[in-house]
Amino acid sequence: MAETGDKPYRAEYAKSGRASCKKCGESIAKDSLRLALMVQSPMFDGKVPHWHHYSCFWKRARIVSHTDIDGFPELRWEDQEKIKKAIETGALQEEKGGTRKEVGKAEKSLTDFAAEYAKSNRSTCKGCEQKIEKGQIRISKKMVHPEKPQLGMIDNWYHPDCFVSRRAELGFLPAYGATQLLGFSILKAEDKETLKKQLPATKTEGKRKGEEVDGNVVAKKKSRKEKEKESKQEKQLKEQTELIWGIKDELRKVCSTNDLKELLIANKQEVPSGENAILDRVADGMAFGALLPCEECKGQFVFKSDAYYCSGDITAWTKCVAKTQTPNRKDWVIPKEFREIPYLKKFKCKKQDRIFPPEAATVNSAPPPPASAPLTETVTAPQDKPLTNMKILTLGKLSKNKEEVKNIVEELGGKMTTTANKATLCISTQKEVEKMSKKMEEVKDAKVRVVSEEFLKDVKSSNKGFQELLSLHAISPWGAEVKTEHQEVAVDGKCSKPANMKSAGKVKEEQGPSKSEKKMKLTVKGGAAVDPDSGLEDSAHVFEKGGKIFSATLGLVDIVKGTNSYYKLQLLEDDRESRYWVFRSWGRVGTVIGSNKLEQMPSKEDAVEHFLNLYEEKTGNSWHSKNFTKYPKKFYPLEIDYGQDEEAVRKLTVSAGTKSKLAKPIQDLIKMIFDVESMKKAMVEFEIDLQKMPLGKLSKRQIQSAYSILNEVQQAVSDGGSESQILDLSNRFYTLIPHDFGMKKPPLLSNLEYIQAKVQMLDNLLDIEVAYSLLRGGNEDGDKDPIDINYEKLRTDIKVVDKDSEEAKIIKQYVKNTHAATHNAYDLKVVEIFRIEREGESQRYKPFKQLHNRQLLWHGSRTTNFAGILSQGLRIAPPEAPVTGYMFGKGIYFADMVSKSANYCHTSQADPIGLILLGEVALGNMYELKNASHITKLPKGKHSVKGLGKTAPDPTATTTLDGVEVPLGNGISTGINDTCLLYNEYIVYDVAQVNLKYLLKLKFNYKTSLW
C-alpha cells in the first residue's frame, strides 16, 4: 500500500467555507464531505489537493479502491459506505437539490471513458506506443495530468485491444460495459457489437469459478467462512469508527481548542497545528491510549489511514521511516482540573490496538499516481534487462511480425514506439537504410542508431557486451551513443568484480538516457551573476558587503517524500541609483516546476534585514554564522554559484589559435583537453544539474565531502545497515552534489554497483574541476594566444613525434598487436603521437629508475580528465573514497593490452577521438593475484600488483625502448584459467613509480556494418 503522501486522492470534511470546487467553481460548505485529486504543483516541489464537491468529484475521477484515498478511515462510517458504494457501482449521482438517485448502470455513460473513430493519424496508443491510424476505433481514458492540472481532463488514447488488456489497470471495472462509453451510440453497428464482446459488463461474483472477462479474472465467489470473517471485520471497524466519532462529537461540545491542547500536553503528546488535527489526536488517545515515543528516534507517532507513522527525524537530514499498526501505548490520563466536565469525569479509557482494514491490492487509478513512487518501489540501481528504459522503433519488413518483435523487446525490458525522436534504437534492414525513405530520414535526423534484427537475438543470448553488440549489428553510419541501464558482466560469469570497478577491461555504461543540457544566459557583474529570472540582470548587481556576496543557492533532498528542491536567494543593488531588491526563486531541480518573487525594499538596511531573515527561515542558521548546522526539514547551502569566471573562460576560448606559436597538432590537442562543451556533456551524462552545479564552482572540498558520504554508505550497505541510515546518507549525497532526476524520485544509494558508479562520477568531476580551475586561473596576456596560455598551465613539455621515427613504429606496432580479440566493436587508428615530459616528474621518478622490471604500459581516461592528468600527474583516489570502488584497492591502474585501456576513453560513434597514455611504470617485484582484493598495503618485498589475465602479449616478442620493456607481442593464452580477468592489470600504489612518456590521439573506427 502506498504511503499516504503518495496516494492520488484525499477525503475530509471541509475546514472552512473558503475552498471552491475545481469542477463547478462554487464554494464547498464548511464541514461538508469533500474529495480531492492530488496533483503536482506547478509552483513548488510538492503536491496540492484539487478539492471537489462530493457529487462533482465523480465526474472527474474514477477510483478503483478506497485504499487510494488518503483520510478515508477518518471519515464517518456512513460516508465511508457511501464512497465504497460509489466506487463499486460508479452510478451514484447527486442532483442540484441535494437529493440522491441511483441510475441504472446501462443508462449511465462513464464520463472518463470514451470511444470514437480517430480523426487523424497523429495520436499514439498509450499502451503499445504505436500510431492509431485515421478512421480506426480508439478508446480514451480521461485523466488529469499530475504535472499539468490546469489542462483539466486529458484524453489518453488506446487501441481497443490495448485498452482491453489494461482494463483493470485503467479502472474500467468488471461492472462497466462498452455501452457506457461516451460516444458509443454513434459508432457503426458492427463496431458496437465488437466492442460489446471485448468489454462486457460482468458481475463481480459469477456462478462459475475462475470466470474471466477478456483475460481479467473476476473475483471468485467467496466462501461462507470468508464472508463471516469480512462481516465480523466490518462490524468491528464500524464500532471503532462510531467510538472515535462519538468522542469527537462530545469533545467539540465540552472542550475548547486550548483544553484539547492541555489534554495532549498532560499525556506527553506533541501538539499539532490545526484544530481538526488536535481533535483527531485527542480522540485517538482517548479511544486507544496515549502513544509512546518512537523507539528509533523518540519522535511522535501519528495516525495516517493505513498505519501510525513516526513524525520525528533520524538526523537533521532524514525523516524517520518507522511505521506500525500496533504502536506501544500507555493509559490516557484525564487531569484533575478536567474532571469538572461530566463527560471527561465518567470517561474510561481502555488501552487497545486500533483495527485496520485488510490491505487491498490497488491498481493505478486516474489520475495516474504521482511521479514519486513509494520508497519500496524506488529504482535503486540499474536493471538486469538490457533494454530497460529504451524505446525501440521498427522500420521495413522484418523476418518476425510486429507482435513477435514487440514481445521480445518487452521481455528484454524495452518498449515499442512509432516516433523517431522518441526512439532509442531503430531495428531495420540494410535495404531500408539504403532506400532512405521519409521515415528513415526522420530516424537519421533524430540521430537514432539503426541495427539489424540479429541484434535482438544476440542481446538476449550472447555473452558479448551491450556496446559491442550495438557496434557489431549497426547498419547506419549515423547514430548517437546509446546509454543502457544494463551493467556488463565478465564473459565467463566467474568474476565477482562489478563491471564498473576501476579495471580497464569493460566499458562502464552510464545510467539511463542522457538529458539535454539546460542553458541559461548569465550576466556576471563583480562577484556573482544576477539571476536572469529577476529581470534585473542588465540594471543591477549582487550586493556585496565586507567581502561577502549576498547570494545563496540552497538544496533539500528527501527521498521518502520524493523531494529534490532548490531555493535561490539574492540581494540586488541598482547599478546607478540607491535602490535594492530581494529576489528569491524555488522549485524542483531539473524541472520547470517552481516560481519566484522579486521585492523592492525601502532601503538598503531593510533589504539586508529581509535577506538575513529569509536565509535564517530557510536554513535555521544566521547568514553570518561561521559553522553551519543542518536542521530537520531545512535547506542546506551549496558551495556553488553561477560561476564568476565564465566571461574570462569565454575570452580564453573564443579566439584560440589565431596567433599560437605551437605546432598545429599540439594546438588541436590543447583545444581538445580544454573543451568546455565536453566537460558540460560529461556532467550531464552523470545526471549532474548544471543549473545548480555549474562548472565554475565544483569545489574540491565539496567533492571530497561527497566521497566521504559514499564511503559511509558503502560500509552501511556491506554491513547490512538500516534503511534509515542509507536514506540519511543518500539525502546528504544528493544535496551536496545536485542531481537532475526530473520528476523521478532520487534513487537510494542501496546497491554497491550504483555506489561505485557514483565513485567514478566523482573521480571524473575532480579532473573536470582541475581543468576548469586552470582555464579560469592566471592572468590574461594580450600578446599570447589563449591556446599558448592554456598550454603553459599544464606545466608539461609536449613534442610531436615523427610518425616515421623508430619510436613511432614501435608504438604503432604496440597498438596494432595488443588489440584484444574480445574488444572487436572498433579498430584503433593512431592519429598523433606526442612525447610528454611533466615538470618535476622525472626527478620524482629518479629513485625508481634503478628498480628492475620497468615496463611501458597503457592508461586510458576520458578527454575531460587530461588537463588534470598532465598538470598534476596520475593520482590515487583520495582517502575519502570507498576502497571497494577499485578491484585491487586505491592505486594507479595500467594494462598491456591497448584496447583494455582504450575502453576507458569513453568514446562513441558520435565522438570517436580519444586520448591514451603510455607510462614508464616501475613494477619491481609483483604481487600476483587472480581475484579482486582490496589492497591497502602491499606484502613485504612487493612493489606492485599484477592481476593475472587469461590472455597477454607474447613475452618472446617484448622489445625495449630507452631501456624500458615494451610488451608488444600479439595476444596469446597465458594458460591461467582460474582467474577473474581476461587480460592483465598492473597497479602501483605510489605515484612516484610512474613516469609518463607518451600521449596518443586515437581514432576509434566503430564497425557500423555487417557487410
From Swiss-Prot:
UniProt-listed SUPFAM superfamilies: ADP-ribosylation, BRCT domain, Domain of poly(ADP-ribose) polymerase, Glucocorticoid receptor-like (DNA-binding domain), WGR domain-like
One MF annotation (Gene Ontology) recorded for this entry: protein homodimerization activity
Function, in words: Poly-ADP-ribosyltransferase that mediates poly-ADP-ribosylation of proteins and plays a key role in DNA repair. Mediates glutamate, aspartate, serine, histidine or tyrosine ADP-ribosylation of proteins: the ADP-D-ribosyl group of NAD(+) is transferred to the acceptor carboxyl group of target residues and further ADP-ribosyl groups are transferred to the 2'-position of the terminal adenosine moiety, building up a polymer with an average chain length of 20-30 units. Serine ADP-ribosylation of proteins constitutes the primary form of ADP-ribosylation of proteins in response to DNA damage.
Compositionally biased spans, kind Basic and acidic residues: 225-235, 506-519
Binding-site residues, Zn(2+) 2: 125, 128, 159, 162
Similarity remark: Belongs to the ARTD/PARP family.
Assembly description: Homodimer; PARP-type zinc-fingers from separate parp1 molecules form a dimer module that specifically recognizes DNA strand breaks.
Name of this chain's protein: Poly [ADP-ribose] polymerase 1
Binding site for Zn(2+) 1: 21, 24, 53, 56
A Gene Ontology biological process term: protein auto-ADP-ribosylation
Keyword line: ADP-ribosylation, Allosteric enzyme, Chromosome, Cytoplasm, DNA damage, DNA repair, DNA-binding, Glycosyltransferase, Immunity, Innate immunity, Isopeptide bond, Metal-binding, NAD, Nucleotidyltransferase, Nucleus, Repeat, Transcription, Transcription regulation, Transferase, Zinc, Zinc-finger
Domain WGR: 539-635
Domain notes for this protein: The two PARP-type zinc-fingers (also named Zn1 and Zn2) specifically recognize DNA strand breaks: PARP-type zinc-finger 1 binds PARP-type zinc-finger 2 from a separate parp1 molecule to form a dimeric module that specifically recognizes DNA strand breaks.
Motif position, Nuclear localization signal: 207-209, 220-225
Annotated PARP alpha-helical domain residues: 659-776
Residues covered by region (Automodification domain): 371-522
Boundaries of every BRCT domain copy: 382-473
The record's account of how the chain is modified after translation: Poly-ADP-ribosylated on serine, glutamate and aspartate residues by autocatalysis. Auto-ADP-ribosylation on serine takes place following interaction with HPF1. Auto poly-ADP-ribosylation on serine residues promotes its dissociation from chromatin.
Location of the region described as Disordered in the Swiss-Prot/TrEMBL record: 198-235, 359-378, 496-519
Stretches assigned to the PARP catalytic domain: 785-1011
Native source organism of the sequence: Gallus gallus (Chicken)
Subcellular location: Chromosome; Nucleus; Nucleus, Nucleolus; Cytoplasm, Cytosol
